[in-house]
């Protein structure tokens, strides 16, 4: 039989139609496991940003690449870009500075204190959902304007660093002196899994409790906003109600009232809002919803030119000052000079205009030389005048311009660097010398560290102190596991576990902690007294070493001789270097590694375990082996016995996995304790073990069970010990940015 042929062009057309045009194969929606079993524990957060996803490869080290960068040359190129207006997206007032300030602000401004997520690190503004949020309309163009510079310097500067640096250069190019800049933001290669809210529609708001308070960890009032609705809460133009929301949302970004005022007043000194037309009639789909031909650009405007004087962004329209590309005091001056009355933008959005007709021509048009306008304010601007606390600050800044300028410079620096962690991570020649309390300062190493012989001797002293293996392990874990990789805060360095507020956290069992720390401090003091040559050891090092030698002892008890790596060089922070309120948000409401769970937790015990493991940058196998090992070591908070599936606690055995997988045990919910399970012998009915959901999930969840079987096998003990030590060492050194 003669076979029919399809012309090449037709075949290509057919292939493209199959790929994009609605074929059954392409369009069929796959029903995933989460649909069938919505309560199934999701392990995907522990598989984010795997090294295999990084096109630069595992040998690429961003810090080294950045150090080879000619930062001055980059800044020179960025400065030149400010006034190189492009026909496809012309600059307002011939200067892109305000546009780039908004880009940098919105990149960093999604940071939130409760879980440390968001912020400029990772360059997440490039990815969904942030690249398509309503509050980020047209910032896709800002990043495209920057592409030639990113293209030129390639791997030497990340998108995260470039966006923040561009914001800094924008300010400087308009006459403002910034506080400094630090590089070091490593780019991500996929969208971070973040709970931005449960709403199903943009600008919806279903994130408040019965008291009207925003749920944690949310940082914004509505889905798709960075902070607040500039028109007022849910679009209601009430300045005092707006002030309340501003205070809450900026506080959730770690800003106090003065920093909040400085940021708003300083930022709104520059640029303008864009609302030339009704967005519903003019603006197309966001980038994520646009076709492939749009090449990642969205919000195509079909009205007028589609840009310039026809630009539509927020729907609000106008500028705050007469010279929007220069640093002036006009924002604050005009806020108090004029009485402001409500009006509407051409797009129909509520804003404010001076009651005085003499203000009608104070502001030049951004594109039309023969056209002028009155200044405008948002409801969120009027809030700075109406709220008594904000009013005191704004009037003080108005009378003291230099104070205002410094406050804005410092607040901008904090905004753009808050998620970077300690100053030890900062890179570049523009890092400011001043140490700031929000950087969680730790004294610089100022003495020779102990050598291997000293470490061995100190370890023996710790073991001879009378402290048990579980006590030493619990203390070291409590100290180191306070780290969260989302914003690089916490950790063992600094020994803040002995300070407020960490010393009184319920998960840390304050009474036992005080006893252990007292003995370790005595060991430290006595040992330092015996050292020569100026050598010293910090309490932070002693705490970690105590846990490490306890693990070695426990492994030996299990018949495995090991050496747990230990690198000295940690220092001890002081209470004066520790902002109690700032550190309070790090307190764990749950820690599945210690089988600790409080009713203040936002999710189930197993889900909170995944959250804690994610904070510690752990993989699924690392999380699994740590839970099993810590149970065997008896490291549960307050010494509770749930999940300690061994008759020899304090020994680093794989008993947790062996006994969890033992089919001679039948599990059932306890009738006496809510949230507890009882494991009984199938034949005798005798109670063998008690457990929490965190313990049992390693046998019930198919993927976790698969890993547990590796460690519960007859040949699993040695692998278990070695893997536990690697994972333990990873946590102990999570905040060692100096090694």
From Swiss-Prot:
Cofactor(s) needed by this chain: heme b
Cofactor note text: Binds 1 heme b (iron(II)-protoporphyrin IX) group per dimer.
Keyword Signal in record: yes
Pfam families cross-referenced by the UniProt entry: peroxidase (PF00141)
Modification after translation, per record: Formation of the three residue Trp-Tyr-Met cross-link is important for the catalase, but not the peroxidase activity of the enzyme.
Keyword terms, alphabetized: Heme, Hydrogen peroxide, Iron, Metal-binding, Oxidoreductase, Peroxidase, Signal
Record: active site: 106 (proton acceptor)
UniProt-annotated site: Transition state stabilizer, residues: 102
SUPFAM superfamilies listed in its UniProt record: Heme-dependent peroxidases (SSF48113)
Tryptophyl-tyrosyl-methioninium (Tyr-Met) (with W-105) crosslink site(s): 227-253
UniProt crosslink position (Tryptophyl-tyrosyl-methioninium (Trp-Tyr) (with M-253)): 105-227
GO cellular component: cytosol
GO biological process, one term: hydrogen peroxide catabolic process
Signal peptide: 1-26
Listed InterPro entries: Catalase_peroxidase, Haem_peroxidase, Haem_peroxidase_sf, Peroxidases_AS, Peroxidases_heam-ligand_BS
Reaction equation(s) it catalyzes: H2O2 + AH2 = A + 2 H2O; 2 H2O2 = O2 + 2 H2O
Sequence positions that bind heme b: 268
Enzyme Commission numbers on file: 1.11.1.21
Subunit structure: Homodimer or homotetramer.
Stored PANTHER family: CATALASE-PEROXIDASE, HYDROPEROXIDASE I, BIFUNCTIONAL CATALASE-PEROXIDASE
Function noted in UniProt: Bifunctional enzyme with both catalase and broad-spectrum peroxidase activity.
Family the UniProt entry places it in: Belongs to the peroxidase family. Peroxidase/catalase subfamily.
Protein name: Catalase-peroxidase 2
Species for this entry: Shewanella sp. (strain MR-7)
């Amino acid at each position: 039989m003669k076979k029919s042929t399809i012309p090449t062009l037709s075949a290509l057309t057919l292939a493209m139609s199959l790929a994009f045009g609605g074929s059954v194969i392409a369009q069929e929606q796959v029903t995933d496991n989460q649909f069938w079993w919505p309560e199934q524990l999701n392990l995907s957060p522990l598989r984010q940003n795997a090294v295999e996803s990084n096109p630069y490869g595992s040998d690429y080290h961003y810090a080294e690449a950045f150090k080879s960068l000619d930062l001055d040359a980059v800044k020179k190129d960025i400065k030149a870009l400010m006034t190189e207006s492009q026909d496809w997206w012309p600059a307002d007032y011939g200067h892109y500075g305000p546009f780039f300030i908004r880009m940098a602000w919105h990149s960093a401004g999604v940071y939130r204190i409760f879980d440390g997520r968001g912020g400029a690190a990772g360059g997440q503004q490039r990815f969904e959902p942030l690249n398509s949020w309503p509050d980020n309309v047209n910032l896709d163009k800002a990043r495209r304007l920057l592409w030639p510079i990113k293209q030129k310097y390639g791997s030497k500067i990340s998108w995260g660093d470039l966006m923040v640096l561009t914001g800094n250069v924008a300010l400087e190019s308009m006459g403002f002196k910034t506080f400094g800049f630090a590089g070091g933001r490593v780019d991500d290669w996929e969208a971070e899994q973040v709970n931005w809210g449960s709403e199903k529609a943009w600008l919806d708001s279903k994130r408040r409790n019965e008291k009207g308070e925003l749920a944690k960890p949310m940082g914004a009032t509505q889905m798709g906003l960075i902070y607040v609705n500039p028109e007022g809460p849910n679009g209601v133009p009430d300045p005092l109600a707006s002030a309340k929301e501003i205070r809450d949302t900026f506080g959730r970004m770690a800003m106090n009232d003065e920093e909040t005022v400085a940021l708003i007043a300083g930022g709104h000194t520059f640029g303008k809002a864009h609302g030339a037309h009704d967005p519903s009639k003019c603006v197309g789909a966001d980038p994520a919803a646009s076709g492939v031909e749009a090449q990642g650009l969205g919000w195509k405007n079909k009205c007028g030119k589609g840009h310039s004087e026809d630009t539509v962004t927020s729907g609000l329209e106008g500028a705050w000052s007469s010279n929007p590309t220069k640093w002036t005091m006009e924002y604050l001056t005009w806020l108090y000079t004029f009485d402001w009355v409500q009006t509407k933008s051409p797009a129909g959005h509520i804003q404010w205009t001076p009651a005085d007709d003499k203000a009608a021509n104070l502001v030049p048009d951004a594109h039309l030389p023969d056209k002028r306008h009155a200044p405008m304010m948002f409801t969120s601007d009027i809030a700075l005048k109406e709220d008594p606390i904000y009013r005191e600050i704004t009037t003080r800044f108005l009378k003291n311009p230099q104070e205002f300028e410094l406050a804005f410079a410092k607040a901008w620096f904090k905004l753009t660097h808050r998620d970077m962690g300690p100053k030890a991570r900062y890179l570049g020649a523009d890092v400011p010398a001043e140490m700031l309390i929000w950087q969680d300062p730790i004294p610089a190493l100022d003495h020779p560290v102990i050598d291997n012989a000293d470490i061995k001797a100190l370890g023996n002293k710790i073991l001879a102190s009378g402290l048990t293996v579980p006590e030493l392990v619990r203390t070291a874990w409590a100290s180191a596991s306070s780290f969260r990789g989302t914003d690089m805060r916490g950790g063992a360095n600094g020994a803040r576990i002995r300070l407020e507020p960490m010393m009184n956290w319920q998960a840390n069992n304050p009474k036992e902690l005080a006893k252990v720390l007292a003995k370790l401090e005595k060991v430290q003091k006595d040992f330092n007294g015996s050292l020569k040559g100026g050598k010293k050891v910090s309490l932070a090092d002693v705490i970690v070493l105590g846990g490490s030698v306890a693990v070695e002892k426990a492994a030996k008890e299990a018949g495995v001789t090991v050496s747990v790596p230990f690198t000295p060089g940690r220092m001890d922070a002081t209470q004066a270097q520790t902002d109690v309120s700032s550190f309070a948000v790090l307190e764990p409401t749950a820690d599945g590694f210690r089988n600790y769970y409080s009713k203040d937790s936002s999710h189930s015990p197993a889900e909170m375990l995944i959250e804690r493991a994610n904070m510690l940058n752990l993989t699924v196998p690392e999380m699994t082996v740590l839970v099993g090992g810590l149970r065997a070591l008896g490291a549960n908070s307050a010494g509770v016995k749930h999940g300690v599936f061994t008759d020899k606690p304090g020994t680093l055995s794989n008993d947790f996995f062996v006994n969890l997988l033992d089919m001679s045990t039948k599990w059932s919910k306890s009738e006496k304790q809510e949230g507890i399970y009882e494991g009984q012998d199938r034949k005798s009915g005798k109670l063998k073990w008690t457990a929490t959901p965190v313990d049992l999930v390693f046998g019930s969840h198919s993927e976790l069970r698969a890993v547990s079987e590796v460690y519960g096998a007859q040949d699993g003990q040695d692998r278990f010990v070695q893997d536990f030590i690697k994972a333990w060492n990873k946590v102990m050194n999570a905040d060692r940015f100096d090694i």
